[in-house]
């Protein structure tokens, strides 16, 4: 897909077609679990553009819960999400060329111990699987 940034609106737009000002985006995702219309995803950015995950997921019909800009505000309100259900739980450094003063990070991975919305997701998932 392609992403075009609108600076004045502080928003990006996704399209299947390239334009003069667009940049290609690549986003890889894996569904970890799902419940009704909600999914817990592991998302990997293959390109790193402004708002890429948020806008790309909304473009394919799966906006982030709690995202007031690209998501569904009625849904956010219904579930009480004031913040995006988006978390960088893992950061992996794989430099393909010399990274200078950051080279000591090459090959290292850092993982967050807990993601704030996962317990809430699984509470809803258990009620989902019992119905």
Stretch-by-stretch model annotation:
Residues 46, 56-131:
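Pseudouridine synthases involved in rRNA/tRNA modification
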Residues 41-43:
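SH3/SH3-like beta-barrel fold
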Residues 1-39, 95-101, 112, 120-121:
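Glycine- and acidic-residue-rich catalytic/RNA-contacting loop of pseudouridine synthases
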Residues 35, 45-47:
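Short loop/turn positions at the edges of beta-strands in beta-sheet-rich folds
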